[in-house]
């Protein structure tokens, strides 16, 4: 009986030692990804699962570069994504940072973000949709195409709707140019689920699904502080407590949009702050006066004219 055949361990092609990266830490430092991830962490409060997924994708691309330097290759991964969540949860901001990370790691050439909706892709008459969609894809090539409320591309109730034509063009480009374009579809989770059920071709091309949770009360307070700091304003102790009360009330009302609603509330507070200073124009202003949002700037909101909920205990992380 002949001896069993043995398989030699996989040996990578030889490469000059000087050309190979050293440790993962060294490769991470030289890639510039650490600062981009840190910037994302500074910009976005909370969202730990989202940040973890972005880090995983960055790690995959970084390790792929190390493998390629040693002669290993599994082919470029498909990185088309779906971001689901309510408005104001950071989907567009994460898409922007994702584009920069992909560029930094050499996955895309330019690293820019092109954000569109159905109206940018779908025409209003025969022969109009294909040129519109192709023009957007041309602009996005080498970067990331972010399609907000992507489910509006598909309208099964209207047989003459041109959205399906845009979808077919997108599918072709997502398959043939996946090494130079990342498409991110975004919207409410339940509607995106129905969209994928009705469009299996699109579902099969989207490998990464990232859910953006709503912010909790404490996170929204931190977001408000961050936004005010960026605008060079501040709360005093009283207005900080009033704004927390404002958020607790506003979160229970219709059309609450997380960080977007926080920004809108702060913008209105700035208007009232400026109006208050103008009404008291004889007073000499100083840095404190010009930068401090007071309780009166917030209490004028119509949110306080409606009854607050009897009890509300925001979920904790």
UniProtKB/Swiss-Prot annotation:
Keywords, in A-Z order = ATP-binding, Nucleotide-binding
- An example Pfam family from this entry, by short name, is AAA
Family according to the record: Belongs to the CbxX/CfxQ family.
Q: What does this protein do?
A: Seems to be necessary for the expression of RuBisCO.
Q: Which domain of life is it from?
A: Bacteria
One GO molecular function term of this record is:
ATP hydrolysis activity
Name of the protein:
Protein CbxX, chromosomal
Question: Which residues are noted in the entry as ATP-binding?
Answer: 85-92
Chain intervals for the UniProt region annotation (Disordered): 1-21
